[in-house]
Amino acid sequence: MAGPSNQTQPPPPVLTQPSLSFTQGLLVGQLSVVLLIGAFIKFFIFGEAPPHPSRNGLSNRTSSHRRSYSLNSISADSSPRTLREKPSTSNILRPVPSSSTNTRSILRKTYYSATPTNPTSKHSRSRPHHSSHQPESLDWFNVLIAQTIAQYRQTAYILKDSPTSSILASLSEALNNPEKKPSFIDSIKVTDISLGEEFPIFSNCRVIAVEDPNSDGGRLQALMDVDLSDDNLSLAVETSLLLNYPKPFSAVLPVALAVSVVRFSGTLCISFVPGPGTSDQTMSPSPSPPKEASAENIAVDHQSPERQSARQRAPHQHKYTNTNTAGATAAATADDNDTHAKLPHGIPKTSLAFSFLPDYRLDLSVRSLIGSRSRLQDVPKVAQLVEARVQAWFEERVVEPRVQVVGLPNIWPRMGRTGVRGSQEETEAGAGGSAPADIPGTAGGDGVGVRGGGGGGGGGGGVGGSGGGSMRGTSGWGMGYDGLRYRHNAHGDGGVGAGPGQSAGAALYGGAQGGGGGGGRGGEEQFAIPGSMPDPVVVT
Protein backbone atom coordinates (compact mmCIF):
# COMPACT_ATOMS: atom_id res chain seq x y z
CA MET A 1 0.00 0.00 0.00
CA ALA A 2 1.46 3.21 -1.16
CA GLY A 3 2.12 5.97 1.27
CA PRO A 4 1.18 9.60 0.88
CA SER A 5 3.07 11.56 -1.75
CA ASN A 6 5.93 13.68 -0.54
CA GLN A 7 5.74 16.03 -3.58
CA THR A 8 4.78 19.64 -2.79
CA GLN A 9 2.96 21.87 -5.25
CA PRO A 10 4.81 25.04 -6.55
CA PRO A 11 3.79 28.38 -5.12
CA PRO A 12 1.56 30.58 -7.32
CA PRO A 13 3.37 33.33 -9.39
CA VAL A 14 3.59 36.69 -7.82
CA LEU A 15 1.99 39.49 -9.96
CA THR A 16 4.29 42.55 -10.49
CA GLN A 17 2.70 45.88 -9.80
CA PRO A 18 3.12 48.55 -12.59
CA SER A 19 5.42 51.46 -11.76
CA LEU A 20 3.00 54.09 -13.23
CA SER A 21 -0.70 54.14 -12.94
CA PHE A 22 -3.09 54.64 -15.86
CA THR A 23 -3.65 58.29 -14.93
CA GLN A 24 0.03 59.00 -14.91
CA GLY A 25 0.52 57.43 -18.35
CA LEU A 26 -2.32 59.43 -19.78
CA LEU A 27 -0.80 62.64 -18.48
CA VAL A 28 2.60 61.80 -19.93
CA GLY A 29 1.10 61.03 -23.34
CA GLN A 30 -0.87 64.27 -23.43
CA LEU A 31 2.20 66.23 -22.38
CA SER A 32 4.31 64.72 -25.16
CA VAL A 33 1.65 65.58 -27.75
CA VAL A 34 1.52 69.16 -26.49
CA LEU A 35 5.30 69.43 -26.71
CA LEU A 36 5.30 68.12 -30.27
CA ILE A 37 2.58 70.57 -31.31
CA GLY A 38 4.45 73.44 -29.65
CA ALA A 39 7.68 72.53 -31.40
CA PHE A 40 5.88 72.34 -34.76
CA ILE A 41 4.27 75.76 -34.26
CA LYS A 42 7.54 77.33 -33.18
CA PHE A 43 9.83 76.02 -35.90
CA PHE A 44 7.45 75.68 -38.86
CA ILE A 45 4.84 78.41 -38.37
CA PHE A 46 6.56 81.18 -36.45
CA GLY A 47 10.04 80.42 -37.76
CA GLU A 48 12.01 82.56 -40.30
CA ALA A 49 10.94 82.07 -43.90
CA PRO A 50 13.55 80.83 -46.37
CA PRO A 51 14.92 83.45 -48.81
CA HIS A 52 13.12 83.98 -52.11
CA PRO A 53 14.48 81.88 -54.99
CA SER A 54 14.99 84.95 -57.20
CA ARG A 55 16.85 86.72 -54.45
CA ASN A 56 18.89 83.56 -53.93
CA GLY A 57 19.83 83.43 -57.59
CA LEU A 58 20.60 87.11 -57.68
CA SER A 59 22.89 86.83 -54.67
CA ASN A 60 24.68 83.89 -56.27
CA ARG A 61 25.15 85.68 -59.57
CA THR A 62 26.30 88.92 -57.98
CA SER A 63 28.29 87.62 -55.06
CA SER A 64 30.84 90.38 -55.50
CA HIS A 65 28.15 93.11 -55.42
CA ARG A 66 26.49 92.88 -52.04
CA ARG A 67 23.97 95.47 -50.97
CA SER A 68 24.97 97.20 -47.75
CA TYR A 69 21.38 97.87 -46.84
CA SER A 70 17.98 96.17 -46.85
CA LEU A 71 14.50 97.25 -47.78
CA ASN A 72 13.60 97.75 -44.12
CA SER A 73 16.70 99.72 -43.23
CA ILE A 74 16.35 103.45 -42.74
CA SER A 75 19.17 105.86 -43.29
CA ALA A 76 20.43 107.95 -40.44
CA ASP A 77 19.48 111.27 -41.99
CA SER A 78 15.87 110.21 -42.76
CA SER A 79 13.33 110.05 -39.95
CA PRO A 80 10.89 107.09 -39.89
CA ARG A 81 7.24 107.80 -40.51
CA THR A 82 4.51 105.71 -38.95
CA LEU A 83 0.96 105.25 -40.17
CA ARG A 84 -0.42 107.28 -37.28
CA GLU A 85 1.51 110.37 -38.23
CA LYS A 86 -0.38 112.68 -40.58
CA PRO A 87 2.04 114.53 -42.84
CA SER A 88 1.33 118.06 -43.92
CA THR A 89 0.03 118.81 -47.39
CA SER A 90 3.39 120.24 -48.43
CA ASN A 91 5.30 117.17 -47.22
CA ILE A 92 3.25 114.31 -48.70
CA LEU A 93 5.86 113.39 -51.31
CA ARG A 94 9.00 112.26 -49.61
CA PRO A 95 12.17 114.07 -50.66
CA VAL A 96 14.42 112.39 -53.19
CA PRO A 97 17.91 111.63 -51.91
CA SER A 98 20.58 113.90 -53.29
CA SER A 99 22.55 110.90 -54.53
CA SER A 100 19.68 109.41 -56.54
CA THR A 101 20.90 110.95 -59.81
CA ASN A 102 24.57 110.51 -59.02
CA THR A 103 26.43 108.49 -61.62
CA ARG A 104 28.35 106.42 -59.10
CA SER A 105 25.18 105.62 -57.16
CA ILE A 106 23.39 104.44 -60.30
CA LEU A 107 26.31 102.27 -61.38
CA ARG A 108 26.64 100.78 -57.90
CA LYS A 109 22.94 99.89 -57.62
CA THR A 110 22.86 98.36 -61.10
CA TYR A 111 26.14 96.42 -60.61
CA TYR A 112 27.81 98.12 -63.59
CA SER A 113 31.46 99.12 -63.49
CA ALA A 114 32.49 101.97 -65.75
CA THR A 115 35.74 103.88 -66.02
CA PRO A 116 35.45 107.69 -65.78
CA THR A 117 36.80 109.79 -68.58
CA ASN A 118 39.82 112.07 -68.66
CA PRO A 119 39.38 115.56 -70.13
CA THR A 120 41.13 116.43 -73.36
CA SER A 121 41.63 119.71 -75.16
CA LYS A 122 40.00 118.67 -78.44
CA HIS A 123 36.67 120.47 -78.85
CA SER A 124 36.84 121.15 -75.08
CA ARG A 125 35.13 117.81 -74.55
CA SER A 126 35.95 114.62 -72.71
CA ARG A 127 37.24 111.66 -74.64
CA PRO A 128 35.40 108.52 -73.53
CA HIS A 129 37.30 105.49 -72.31
CA HIS A 130 36.03 101.96 -72.60
CA SER A 131 34.34 100.67 -69.48
CA SER A 132 35.60 97.66 -67.60
CA HIS A 133 32.20 95.99 -67.98
CA GLN A 134 31.82 93.23 -70.54
CA PRO A 135 30.39 94.65 -73.82
CA GLU A 136 26.95 93.45 -74.87
CA SER A 137 25.97 91.96 -78.22
CA LEU A 138 22.59 93.75 -78.57
CA ASP A 139 21.02 90.92 -80.57
CA TRP A 140 17.61 91.58 -79.02
CA PHE A 141 17.94 95.28 -79.84
CA ASN A 142 18.69 94.50 -83.48
CA VAL A 143 15.48 92.49 -83.73
CA LEU A 144 13.38 95.33 -82.31
CA ILE A 145 15.02 97.95 -84.55
CA ALA A 146 14.56 95.71 -87.59
CA GLN A 147 10.85 95.32 -86.85
CA THR A 148 10.47 99.09 -86.46
CA ILE A 149 12.28 99.88 -89.71
CA ALA A 150 10.33 97.22 -91.59
CA GLN A 151 7.08 98.73 -90.31
CA TYR A 152 8.12 102.21 -91.45
CA ARG A 153 9.09 100.93 -94.90
CA GLN A 154 5.80 99.12 -95.34
CA THR A 155 3.79 102.11 -94.14
CA ALA A 156 5.70 104.43 -96.49
CA TYR A 157 4.89 102.18 -99.44
CA ILE A 158 1.22 101.90 -98.50
CA LEU A 159 0.95 105.70 -98.34
CA LYS A 160 2.85 106.28 -101.60
CA ASP A 161 -0.28 107.60 -103.33
CA SER A 162 -1.23 109.97 -100.52
CA PRO A 163 -0.94 113.62 -101.64
CA THR A 164 0.23 114.89 -98.23
CA SER A 165 1.59 112.01 -96.14
CA SER A 166 3.76 110.23 -98.70
CA ILE A 167 7.53 110.23 -98.60
CA LEU A 168 7.57 111.52 -102.18
CA ALA A 169 5.61 114.63 -101.22
CA SER A 170 7.87 115.26 -98.23
CA LEU A 171 11.06 114.92 -100.26
CA SER A 172 9.75 117.08 -103.09
CA GLU A 173 8.74 119.79 -100.64
CA ALA A 174 12.12 119.67 -98.89
CA LEU A 175 14.18 119.71 -102.07
CA ASN A 176 12.16 122.51 -103.68
CA ASN A 177 12.22 124.82 -100.67
CA PRO A 178 12.51 128.28 -102.26
CA GLU A 179 14.47 129.64 -99.31
CA LYS A 180 17.23 127.04 -99.71
CA LYS A 181 17.25 126.21 -103.40
CA PRO A 182 19.45 128.52 -105.51
CA SER A 183 17.87 130.53 -108.30
CA PHE A 184 19.97 128.86 -111.00
CA ILE A 185 18.43 125.44 -110.26
CA ASP A 186 15.10 124.53 -111.79
CA SER A 187 12.42 122.50 -110.05
CA ILE A 188 13.84 119.26 -108.63
CA LYS A 189 11.86 116.15 -109.46
CA VAL A 190 12.30 112.90 -107.53
CA THR A 191 12.38 110.01 -109.98
CA ASP A 192 13.38 107.02 -107.86
CA ILE A 193 13.30 106.18 -104.13
CA SER A 194 14.59 102.99 -102.54
CA LEU A 195 14.18 102.54 -98.79
CA GLY A 196 16.47 99.53 -98.70
CA GLU A 197 16.03 95.93 -97.67
CA GLU A 198 18.70 95.35 -95.00
CA PHE A 199 18.81 96.52 -91.39
CA PRO A 200 21.53 98.15 -89.30
CA ILE A 201 23.40 95.87 -86.93
CA PHE A 202 24.27 97.22 -83.47
CA SER A 203 26.97 95.56 -81.39
CA ASN A 204 29.61 96.09 -78.71
CA CYS A 205 27.50 98.24 -76.40
CA ARG A 206 29.23 99.75 -73.37
CA VAL A 207 28.27 102.40 -70.84
CA ILE A 208 30.74 105.08 -69.82
CA ALA A 209 30.66 108.04 -67.47
CA VAL A 210 31.39 111.44 -68.99
CA GLU A 211 31.95 114.70 -67.19
CA ASP A 212 29.09 117.16 -67.20
CA PRO A 213 29.26 120.38 -65.15
CA ASN A 214 25.47 120.69 -65.09
CA SER A 215 24.82 117.33 -63.42
CA ASP A 216 25.95 115.76 -60.18
CA GLY A 217 28.73 113.27 -60.80
CA GLY A 218 28.58 113.61 -64.58
CA ARG A 219 26.23 111.69 -66.83
CA LEU A 220 26.12 108.22 -68.32
CA GLN A 221 26.55 107.62 -72.03
CA ALA A 222 26.03 104.44 -74.02
CA LEU A 223 28.33 103.71 -76.95
CA MET A 224 27.44 101.10 -79.55
CA ASP A 225 28.90 100.19 -82.92
CA VAL A 226 26.52 100.30 -85.87
CA ASP A 227 27.07 98.87 -89.33
CA LEU A 228 24.87 98.99 -92.44
CA SER A 229 26.22 97.43 -95.62
CA ASP A 230 25.04 95.74 -98.82
CA ASP A 231 21.80 97.69 -98.77
CA ASN A 232 19.84 99.27 -101.59
CA LEU A 233 19.20 102.73 -100.14
CA SER A 234 19.13 105.23 -103.00
CA LEU A 235 17.56 108.46 -104.24
CA ALA A 236 17.41 109.65 -107.87
CA VAL A 237 16.44 113.16 -108.95
CA GLU A 238 16.45 115.21 -112.12
CA THR A 239 16.60 118.97 -112.59
CA SER A 240 18.04 121.64 -114.86
CA LEU A 241 20.71 124.29 -114.42
CA LEU A 242 19.43 127.67 -115.59
CA LEU A 243 21.78 130.24 -117.11
CA ASN A 244 20.19 133.63 -116.42
CA TYR A 245 22.89 135.81 -117.98
CA PRO A 246 22.69 137.98 -120.06
CA LYS A 247 18.97 137.34 -119.89
CA PRO A 248 16.81 134.90 -117.89
CA PHE A 249 16.70 131.34 -119.19
CA SER A 250 19.44 131.93 -121.72
CA ALA A 251 20.42 128.26 -121.57
CA VAL A 252 19.18 125.14 -119.82
CA LEU A 253 21.43 122.22 -118.87
CA PRO A 254 19.55 119.05 -117.86
CA VAL A 255 21.07 117.13 -114.95
CA ALA A 256 20.12 113.74 -113.50
CA LEU A 257 21.65 112.34 -110.30
CA ALA A 258 21.35 109.08 -108.40
CA VAL A 259 22.89 108.77 -104.92
CA SER A 260 23.16 105.40 -103.18
CA VAL A 261 24.49 104.50 -99.75
CA VAL A 262 27.03 101.71 -100.16
CA ARG A 263 28.03 101.34 -96.52
CA PHE A 264 27.74 103.18 -93.25
CA SER A 265 29.55 102.33 -90.03
CA GLY A 266 30.32 104.30 -86.90
CA THR A 267 29.90 104.58 -83.16
CA LEU A 268 26.54 105.79 -81.87
CA CYS A 269 26.44 107.75 -78.60
CA ILE A 270 23.18 107.80 -76.63
CA SER A 271 22.54 109.66 -73.39
CA PHE A 272 19.64 111.16 -71.45
CA VAL A 273 19.57 114.87 -70.67
CA PRO A 274 17.32 116.49 -68.04
CA GLY A 275 15.40 118.84 -70.30
CA PRO A 276 15.40 120.72 -73.59
CA GLY A 277 16.70 123.95 -72.08
CA THR A 278 19.50 122.29 -70.17
CA SER A 279 20.39 119.99 -73.03
CA ASP A 280 20.72 122.90 -75.44
CA GLN A 281 23.24 124.53 -73.16
CA THR A 282 25.04 121.34 -72.24
CA MET A 283 25.30 119.63 -75.59
CA SER A 284 25.58 122.90 -77.59
CA PRO A 285 23.77 121.78 -80.74
CA SER A 286 23.93 123.95 -83.80
CA PRO A 287 21.03 126.41 -83.97
CA SER A 288 18.44 125.50 -86.55
CA PRO A 289 16.87 128.12 -88.79
CA PRO A 290 13.64 129.50 -87.36
CA LYS A 291 11.86 128.97 -90.66
CA GLU A 292 12.21 125.20 -90.42
CA ALA A 293 10.70 125.13 -86.97
CA SER A 294 7.86 127.37 -88.01
CA ALA A 295 7.17 125.26 -91.08
CA GLU A 296 7.07 122.10 -89.00
CA ASN A 297 4.76 123.71 -86.48
CA ILE A 298 2.47 124.85 -89.27
CA ALA A 299 2.43 121.31 -90.69
CA VAL A 300 1.61 119.81 -87.31
CA ASP A 301 -1.08 122.39 -86.64
CA HIS A 302 -2.52 121.77 -90.09
CA GLN A 303 -2.76 118.06 -89.41
CA SER A 304 -4.19 118.32 -85.91
CA PRO A 305 -7.83 118.96 -87.02
CA GLU A 306 -7.60 115.91 -89.29
CA ARG A 307 -6.37 113.83 -86.35
CA GLN A 308 -9.26 114.98 -84.19
CA SER A 309 -11.85 114.23 -86.84
CA ALA A 310 -10.26 110.84 -87.54
CA ARG A 311 -10.28 109.99 -83.85
CA GLN A 312 -13.97 110.89 -83.65
CA ARG A 313 -14.78 108.59 -86.56
CA ALA A 314 -12.57 105.76 -85.36
CA PRO A 315 -15.06 104.00 -82.99
CA HIS A 316 -17.57 103.58 -85.83
CA GLN A 317 -15.10 102.46 -88.48
CA HIS A 318 -12.91 99.94 -86.66
CA LYS A 319 -13.93 96.38 -87.41
CA TYR A 320 -11.39 94.04 -85.87
CA THR A 321 -10.42 93.73 -82.27
CA ASN A 322 -6.74 94.40 -82.83
CA THR A 323 -7.63 97.72 -84.42
CA ASN A 324 -8.05 99.08 -80.91
CA THR A 325 -4.30 98.86 -80.42
CA ALA A 326 -3.53 101.10 -83.37
CA GLY A 327 -6.34 103.49 -82.48
CA ALA A 328 -4.99 103.73 -78.97
CA THR A 329 -1.54 104.46 -80.39
CA ALA A 330 -2.86 107.34 -82.47
CA ALA A 331 -4.87 108.66 -79.54
CA ALA A 332 -1.82 108.40 -77.32
CA THR A 333 0.21 110.43 -79.81
CA ALA A 334 -2.38 113.20 -79.83
CA ASP A 335 -2.68 113.05 -76.04
CA ASP A 336 1.07 113.37 -75.65
CA ASN A 337 1.11 116.40 -77.93
CA ASP A 338 -1.68 118.00 -75.92
CA THR A 339 0.07 117.18 -72.65
CA HIS A 340 3.34 118.65 -73.81
CA ALA A 341 1.56 121.77 -74.98
CA LYS A 342 -0.09 122.21 -71.58
CA LEU A 343 3.12 121.70 -69.59
CA PRO A 344 4.57 124.90 -68.11
CA HIS A 345 7.79 126.09 -69.67
CA GLY A 346 9.65 125.87 -66.36
CA ILE A 347 9.12 122.11 -65.95
CA PRO A 348 12.05 120.16 -67.44
CA LYS A 349 11.36 117.25 -69.74
CA THR A 350 13.70 114.30 -70.12
CA SER A 351 15.12 114.05 -73.63
CA LEU A 352 17.23 111.58 -75.56
CA ALA A 353 20.43 112.91 -77.12
CA PHE A 354 22.23 110.87 -79.79
CA SER A 355 25.18 111.52 -82.06
CA PHE A 356 28.00 109.76 -83.88
CA LEU A 357 31.70 109.91 -83.16
CA PRO A 358 33.84 111.64 -85.82
CA ASP A 359 35.45 108.34 -86.87
CA TYR A 360 32.39 107.25 -88.87
CA ARG A 361 32.47 105.87 -92.39
CA LEU A 362 29.95 106.83 -95.07
CA ASP A 363 30.53 105.41 -98.55
CA LEU A 364 28.33 106.79 -101.32
CA SER A 365 27.85 105.91 -104.97
CA VAL A 366 26.96 108.90 -107.16
CA ARG A 367 25.77 108.42 -110.76
CA SER A 368 25.29 111.47 -112.95
CA LEU A 369 23.99 112.29 -116.41
CA ILE A 370 24.52 115.82 -117.75
CA GLY A 371 23.35 117.27 -121.05
CA SER A 372 20.67 116.66 -123.64
CA ARG A 373 22.35 116.08 -127.01
CA SER A 374 25.92 115.36 -125.90
CA ARG A 375 25.54 113.62 -122.57
CA LEU A 376 28.25 113.23 -119.95
CA GLN A 377 27.96 110.24 -117.68
CA ASP A 378 29.46 109.82 -114.21
CA VAL A 379 31.45 113.03 -114.09
CA PRO A 380 34.00 112.67 -111.23
CA LYS A 381 33.78 116.31 -110.20
CA VAL A 382 30.01 116.12 -109.84
CA ALA A 383 30.36 113.00 -107.71
CA GLN A 384 32.89 114.76 -105.46
CA LEU A 385 30.64 117.80 -105.03
CA VAL A 386 27.57 115.73 -104.19
CA GLU A 387 29.46 113.48 -101.78
CA ALA A 388 31.04 116.45 -100.01
CA ARG A 389 27.63 118.11 -99.64
CA VAL A 390 26.06 114.97 -98.18
CA GLN A 391 28.98 114.53 -95.79
CA ALA A 392 28.67 118.16 -94.65
CA TRP A 393 24.90 117.81 -94.18
CA PHE A 394 25.43 114.74 -92.00
CA GLU A 395 28.24 116.26 -89.92
CA GLU A 396 26.29 119.46 -89.26
CA ARG A 397 23.52 117.49 -87.58
CA VAL A 398 24.59 114.28 -85.83
CA VAL A 399 28.39 114.20 -85.61
CA GLU A 400 30.15 115.20 -82.38
CA PRO A 401 30.15 117.81 -80.93
CA ARG A 402 26.67 118.32 -82.45
CA VAL A 403 23.84 116.11 -81.24
CA GLN A 404 20.18 115.53 -81.95
CA VAL A 405 17.89 115.99 -78.93
CA VAL A 406 14.53 114.18 -79.03
CA GLY A 407 11.90 114.55 -76.31
CA LEU A 408 10.74 111.31 -74.76
CA PRO A 409 6.99 110.59 -74.80
CA ASN A 410 4.87 110.20 -71.70
CA ILE A 411 4.63 106.49 -70.83
CA TRP A 412 2.23 106.80 -67.91
CA PRO A 413 -0.57 104.21 -68.38
CA ARG A 414 -3.79 105.77 -69.67
CA MET A 415 -7.10 104.39 -70.81
CA GLY A 416 -6.88 106.46 -73.99
CA ARG A 417 -3.96 104.38 -75.23
CA THR A 418 -5.15 101.02 -73.93
CA GLY A 419 -5.62 98.35 -76.61
CA VAL A 420 -6.61 94.70 -76.84
CA ARG A 421 -4.57 92.17 -78.75
CA GLY A 422 -6.75 90.37 -81.30
CA SER A 423 -6.32 87.24 -83.40
CA GLN A 424 -5.12 88.95 -86.55
CA GLU A 425 -3.81 85.72 -88.05
CA GLU A 426 -7.27 84.14 -87.93
CA THR A 427 -8.81 87.28 -89.40
CA GLU A 428 -6.39 87.31 -92.31
CA ALA A 429 -6.89 83.59 -92.92
CA GLY A 430 -10.66 84.07 -93.06
CA ALA A 431 -10.27 86.90 -95.55
CA GLY A 432 -8.82 84.48 -98.12
CA GLY A 433 -5.52 86.24 -98.63
CA SER A 434 -7.03 89.65 -99.25
CA ALA A 435 -5.54 92.75 -97.73
CA PRO A 436 -6.67 93.19 -94.12
CA ALA A 437 -8.90 96.07 -93.32
CA ASP A 438 -6.65 97.26 -90.53
CA ILE A 439 -3.73 98.30 -92.71
CA PRO A 440 -2.58 101.81 -91.80
CA GLY A 441 -3.51 104.46 -94.28
CA THR A 442 -6.61 102.70 -95.64
CA ALA A 443 -10.21 103.68 -95.10
CA GLY A 444 -11.50 103.23 -91.61
CA GLY A 445 -8.30 104.20 -89.80
CA ASP A 446 -6.85 107.18 -88.08
CA GLY A 447 -5.04 108.85 -90.94
CA VAL A 448 -2.30 110.33 -88.83
CA GLY A 449 0.74 111.38 -90.87
CA VAL A 450 3.98 112.83 -89.68
CA ARG A 451 5.92 114.67 -92.29
CA GLY A 452 9.63 115.26 -92.23
CA GLY A 453 12.28 116.69 -94.46
CA GLY A 454 15.83 117.92 -94.69
CA GLY A 455 17.40 120.82 -96.49
CA GLY A 456 20.40 121.18 -98.71
CA GLY A 457 20.16 117.90 -100.52
CA GLY A 458 19.04 116.05 -97.43
CA GLY A 459 16.25 113.64 -97.02
CA GLY A 460 12.86 113.44 -95.45
CA GLY A 461 10.41 110.86 -94.43
CA GLY A 462 6.72 110.28 -94.19
CA VAL A 463 5.32 107.99 -91.59
CA GLY A 464 1.77 106.97 -92.07
CA GLY A 465 -0.71 106.88 -89.29
CA SER A 466 -2.03 103.85 -87.65
CA GLY A 467 -5.72 103.23 -88.03
CA GLY A 468 -5.59 99.56 -87.81
CA GLY A 469 -3.45 97.66 -85.37
CA SER A 470 -0.21 95.87 -85.88
CA MET A 471 1.05 94.74 -89.26
CA ARG A 472 2.24 91.33 -88.16
CA GLY A 473 1.97 88.61 -90.76
CA THR A 474 1.73 90.99 -93.74
CA SER A 475 4.72 90.51 -95.97
CA GLY A 476 5.95 93.39 -98.06
CA TRP A 477 7.10 91.16 -100.86
CA GLY A 478 3.61 89.72 -101.19
CA MET A 479 2.21 93.16 -101.95
CA GLY A 480 3.79 93.52 -105.37
CA TYR A 481 6.72 95.85 -104.82
CA ASP A 482 10.36 95.04 -105.37
CA GLY A 483 12.52 95.85 -102.36
CA LEU A 484 10.31 98.79 -101.35
CA ARG A 485 11.58 100.66 -104.39
CA TYR A 486 9.14 103.34 -105.54
CA ARG A 487 9.64 104.83 -108.97
CA HIS A 488 7.69 108.00 -109.57
CA ASN A 489 6.69 108.88 -113.10
CA ALA A 490 3.86 111.27 -113.90
CA HIS A 491 1.67 110.61 -116.91
CA GLY A 492 3.75 111.57 -119.89
CA ASP A 493 6.10 113.93 -118.07
CA GLY A 494 9.30 112.15 -118.98
CA GLY A 495 10.24 110.60 -115.65
CA VAL A 496 12.46 107.65 -115.03
CA GLY A 497 10.68 104.34 -115.39
CA ALA A 498 12.00 100.95 -114.40
CA GLY A 499 10.57 97.49 -114.39
CA PRO A 500 10.93 94.88 -111.71
CA GLY A 501 14.02 93.44 -113.36
CA GLN A 502 15.70 96.76 -114.07
CA SER A 503 18.21 98.45 -111.84
CA ALA A 504 18.20 102.10 -110.85
CA GLY A 505 21.30 102.86 -112.91
CA ALA A 506 19.79 101.29 -116.02
CA ALA A 507 16.63 103.30 -115.57
CA LEU A 508 18.65 106.47 -115.05
CA TYR A 509 20.76 106.11 -118.17
CA GLY A 510 18.07 104.67 -120.38
CA GLY A 511 19.83 101.39 -121.06
CA ALA A 512 18.96 97.74 -120.57
CA GLN A 513 15.26 98.32 -120.70
CA GLY A 514 13.43 95.54 -118.87
CA GLY A 515 9.97 94.36 -119.57
CA GLY A 516 6.93 93.94 -117.49
CA GLY A 517 6.78 97.22 -115.59
CA GLY A 518 3.72 97.53 -113.41
CA GLY A 519 1.22 100.27 -112.89
CA GLY A 520 1.81 102.12 -116.16
CA ARG A 521 5.54 102.56 -115.37
CA GLY A 522 6.90 99.80 -117.57
CA GLY A 523 10.45 99.08 -118.65
CA GLU A 524 9.72 100.36 -122.18
CA GLU A 525 9.70 103.95 -120.97
CA GLN A 526 12.90 105.80 -121.83
CA PHE A 527 14.74 108.38 -119.81
CA ALA A 528 13.59 111.84 -120.88
CA ILE A 529 14.79 115.27 -119.79
CA PRO A 530 14.07 118.70 -121.38
CA GLY A 531 15.36 118.85 -124.92
CA SER A 532 15.72 116.30 -127.66
CA MET A 533 17.40 113.03 -126.77
CA PRO A 534 19.23 110.57 -129.05
CA ASP A 535 18.69 106.87 -128.95
CA PRO A 536 19.48 105.26 -125.60
CA VAL A 537 23.04 104.05 -125.14
CA VAL A 538 23.76 100.90 -123.19
CA VAL A 539 26.14 101.58 -120.31
CA THR A 540 28.89 99.00 -119.94
From Swiss-Prot:
Known function: Component of the ERMES/MDM complex, which serves as a molecular tether to connect the endoplasmic reticulum (ER) and mitochondria. Components of this complex are involved in the control of mitochondrial shape and protein biogenesis, and function in nonvesicular lipid trafficking between the ER and mitochondria. The MDM12-MMM1 subcomplex functions in the major beta-barrel assembly pathway that is responsible for biogenesis of all outer membrane beta-barrel proteins, and acts in a late step after the SAM complex.
Record protein name field: Maintenance of mitochondrial morphology protein 1
GO biological process, one term: protein insertion into mitochondrial outer membrane
Composition bias, Gly residues: 442-471, 511-521
Location of the SMP-LTD domain: 134-409
Keyword vocabulary terms for this entry: Endoplasmic reticulum, Lipid transport, Lipid-binding, Membrane, Transmembrane, Transmembrane helix, Transport
Membrane topology: Single-pass type I membrane protein
GO MF assignments: lipid binding
Domain description: The SMP-LTD domain is a barrel-like domain that can bind various types of glycerophospholipids in its interior and mediate their transfer between two adjacent bilayers.
The organism of origin for this protein: Blastomyces gilchristii (strain SLH14081) (Blastomyces dermatitidis)
Family to which the UniProt record says this protein belongs: Belongs to the MMM1 family.
Gene Ontology CC: endoplasmic reticulum membrane; ERMES complex
Compositionally biased intervals (Basic residues): 122-132
Biased composition (Low complexity): 321-331
Membrane-traversing stretches: 26-46
Bias kind Polar residues: ranges: 69-81, 88-105, 112-121
PANTHER family for this protein: SMP-LTD DOMAIN-CONTAINING PROTEIN, TEX2 PROTEIN-RELATED
Record note on quaternary structure: Homodimer. Component of the ER-mitochondria encounter structure (ERMES) or MDM complex, composed of MMM1, MDM10, MDM12 and MDM34. A MMM1 homodimer associates with one molecule of MDM12 on each side in a pairwise head-to-tail manner, and the SMP-LTD domains of MMM1 and MDM12 generate a continuous hydrophobic tunnel for phospholipid trafficking.
Cytoplasmic compartment residues: 47-540
Region (Disordered): 52-135, 275-331, 416-471, 509-540
Topology feature Lumenal, residues: 1-25
